[in-house]
Amino acid sequence: MKKSKIIILITLITLTFSACTKKESSKTTTPETKTTVEKNESVSTTWMDVTSIKSVYVDTGIFEHIGFAVPAANLPKENILAGVKYHGTSITLENESKPDTIMWPFSKGIKEEELEDFTSSKGVKIKVPVQSKLNFAPLDNTMKICRDNGLKMRGHVLVWHSQTPKTFFCEDYNASKGFVSAKEMDARQEWYIKSVFQHTKDWEAKNNNGNIIIYAWDIVNEAISDNASASAYLRDGSNWYAIYKNADFIVSAFQYANKYAPKEVLLAYNDYNEFQGEKHNGYLKIIDLILAEKNNPELPSRIDIAGMQSHNQTGWPSMIEYETCIKNFIAKGLDIHITELDITGSWKGGNNFNKADPEAQKRTYNQYFKLYQKYRKTENTNGITGITFWGITDENSWRGNASPLLFNHFEPKPAYYGVIEAAN
């Protein structure tokens, strides 16, 4: 009798323990299921379910690169990186390779003991920040991601009126002091350009068997005035212009870039509204000034690429005006990168634009990509070699309210199909 009671008691304990275990197991699986649902809801894969832009335009040999502008913090995100690799071959950092990021450690000033001697190619002796005062971490991290994922990169940008610390232009790197002379600024420019190219070359040598990751750089960006005239075409409100009063800083930048960049790295001038009247003529003058120093025996220049930003609208510019711009750049013996492509609706003033009508936007993208193919680079002619979209999805675009891109929340828009259909 006692034995039976013991058996019954053991059985009851076993059943109770089993029930508790199932109940506890049910509890622990609930958060896991919830996490999975949340992940699926937040990571849309719809842009991965359509034909890749790369397969249509790069794998077929039409262009060398299709690229996207991406903030450094977003690139490692699984859904973004996967889509960039699927649709493109190249990225451009929106901000992290600009001077204010790289010069950030001395943007508020620098101590005397953090300076070292530098002698320019023209024999000018100056003090410059030690290399440890340059912030290359975001650039290095991005090069590593590109290397690990088979991507290339456009460097953006070395010389620009914006996003460059004022300290870089001032005596003793002190923003409260006056500007340095053009002679000293020229030496500082050389030091900075040399530092960037030397760092990237060293990184690629150490971490990528010397193979190039950054295949092109925007050497000078947006130096032409929006109100350009035949006699005055340079942007005159910049610190660069305040010191030089002429285009010498543009030409010297391409001379120093040619001296320090690997020969396979393409050197570009980049601007917006590049097709427009006197601004376009100013662009052509800059190209001529750079080319004029091509055979300089002491410091030859080089320019390979005319960068057309192409922040355009569905009704502007006219296709004739845009095509003429392309033809004029090719006639200078340059290849072309479409560097920052997006298409909004009409302009409302300032940096405000109407939302693009979906069908008009699709039609415009379609017309552009037909035009780009018409003027693509061939064995015998210069031409367009790559197109970079300035962003991935509308909600993260700098002009997000105007819906300028091919994807919205990672879902393809009619504009995407306009791009794909242009190749068919």
Positions of PLM-derived features:
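Bacterial Sec-dependent N-terminal signal peptides
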Residues: 17-49
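Hydrophobic faces of well-ordered beta-strands that scaffold small-molecule active sites
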Residues: 64-70, 89-93, 153-157, 215-219, ...
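Aromatic-rich peripheral "rim/lid" segments of glycoside hydrolase catalytic domains that contact
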Residues: 103, 223-224, 228-243, 321-337, ...
